[in-house]
Amino acid sequence: MAKMHTRTKGKSGSTKPIRSESPAWSTATTEEITKVVLDLWKQGNSTSVIGMVLRDNYGVPDVKLATGKKVTEILRDNSEEPNVPEDLYNLIVKAIGLRKHLVVNNKDVHNKRSLQSAESKIRRLVKYYQSTKVLPIDWKYKPETAEMLITR
């Protein structure tokens, strides 16, 4: 499968094993996992970091198998849902960093192209999230106000 704004192929990755239930050696209960997820979220961790901490420190290989819900669903049920989905958040942070870099280095044409690619991906993701009703229809990405968007 090709990457979006290059001619190269992406790296191949491993696939998750097909399972319908949590493994027997994972003994964490749904309540414990929910408590840890909420604590880690309040400390300022992202959903992917929460999943890695649960995997590495608490022996939970898959939150969805253990609880029946994804990390974002657990947060949504406890009124702690993020304003912006994590992949969109990361792209906005990248675009902000590139804009700051280009203010100082305005002749850096390669990173101007990187900024264009990042903002194209942002617009494409916004359109997707609006169609799936994750973001409101009137939600817009504006580079001038992007830093305010990413604060929790």
UniProtKB/Swiss-Prot annotation:
Single Gene Ontology MF annotation: structural constituent of ribosome
SMART domains cross-referenced by the UniProt entry: Ribosomal_S13_N (SM01386), Ribosomal_S15 (SM01387)
Gene3D superfamilies referenced in this protein's UniProt entry, alphabetically: 4.10.860.130, S15/NS1, RNA-binding
Pfam families listed in its UniProt record: Ribosomal_S13_N, Ribosomal_S15
Polar residues: compositionally biased ranges: 11-26
Keyword Ribonucleoprotein attributed: yes
Keywords: Ribonucleoprotein, Ribosomal protein
Assigned GO CC terms: cytosolic small ribosomal subunit
Domain of life: Archaea
GO biological process: translation
Region (Disordered) residue spans: 1-26
Basic residues bias: start-end ranges: 1-10
Assembly and interaction partners: Part of the 30S ribosomal subunit.
Family named by the database record: Belongs to the universal ribosomal protein uS15 family.
HAMAP family: Ribosomal_uS15_A
Name under which the protein is recorded: Small ribosomal subunit protein uS15
Lineage: Archaea, Methanobacteriati, Methanobacteriota, Stenosarchaea group, Methanomicrobia
